Amino acid sequence: MTQAATLSPTPFGRVVTAMVTPFDASGAVDLSVAANLARHLVEQGSDGLLVCGTTGESPTLSWDEQLQLLQAVRDAVGSDAKVLAGTGSNSTAEAVEATKEAAAAGADGALVVVPYYNKPPQEGLEAHFRAIAEAAPELPLMLYNIPGRTGCSIAPATVARLMDCPNVVSFKAASGTTEEVTALRLACGPQLAIYSGDDGLTLPMLAVGAVGVVSVGSHVAGPEIRAMIEAYLNGDGASALALHDALIPLFKALFATTNPIPVKAALELNGWSVGAPRPPLCSLSDDMKRSLSNAMAALRQT
């Protein structure tokens, strides 16, 4: 195991679930289901909960809906888990305001995505994140790099320059490569807590310095994901690898099409009335739902 996995801070624990946003039959946010789901996820091993991220369908939620959801989840779990709010935007002014509101609402941290669509250069990205950090200096920030959705990527050297902001404490690596984790660790040192942003890469990323995962799969496989991470940290590589191998078919099914379409279907299969995604996303096809159900059943048998 890498020293970074044990020496780096874990400001939000090891397993952070990127929560879905439940909708009722009318398409409105269902705060009651969200609260119940939040408590369930903590019982299943989540140290932290992220509301209104990619999985939470933030692009189709109003800021008022996002704030209500944050408050409902915060009230539901109390001090039993860290609660992060997705406050990113491709408008710096909007991201600053959302982050300040999240801090005032009692969030334990904010996930701030690289600005999407307008593709700022590195100096623009640095100024963007610095403005957010300075606007809410007491709120720990997790920078979020997901170039497949945003169209641009923040460089490790840019992140390193931002480390003089005391509240830039963590990074969600969702570029799909372990190389990003290595580059960040070398550029920023062990004080930056790097989280895998890809369920299937959690174990490989732990091996090169990540401290945990911001997970989608933990909605339905929280205990197994937690056990994999703990086995690795305890030096039991064989058990960690066996759990990784057992989880991969589920992860493939959960990302067979655009997230969060499959995970909402998985929750419905487990009896959670979270509703379909808001348009322009859609429900999971019957064929994919059968494959997903089979993958969930196979994991239960391991």
Curated annotation (Swiss-Prot):
Q: Which reaction does it catalyse?
A: L-aspartate 4-semialdehyde + pyruvate = (2S,4S)-4-hydroxy-2,3,4,5-tetrahydrodipicolinate + H2O + H(+)
In this chain, pyruvate is annotated as bound at T55, V214
Keyword Amino-acid biosynthesis carried by entry: yes
What EC number(s) does the entry state?
4.3.3.7
The pathway it acts in is: Amino-acid biosynthesis; L-lysine biosynthesis via DAP pathway; (S)-tetrahydrodipicolinate from L-aspartate: step 3/4
Q: Where is the active site?
A: Y144, K172
Gene Ontology molecular function: 4-hydroxy-tetrahydrodipicolinate synthase activity
Query: Major location, coarse class?
Result: cytoplasm
**Localization (cell):** Cytoplasm
Q: How does it assemble?
A: Homotetramer; dimer of dimers.
Family named by the database record: Belongs to the DapA family.
PANTHER family named in the record: 4-HYDROXY-2-OXOGLUTARATE ALDOLASE, MITOCHONDRIAL, DIHYDRODIPICOLINATE SYNTHASE
Name it: 4-hydroxy-tetrahydrodipicolinate synthase
Instruction: Supply the source organism for this entry.
Output: Synechococcus sp. (strain CC9605)
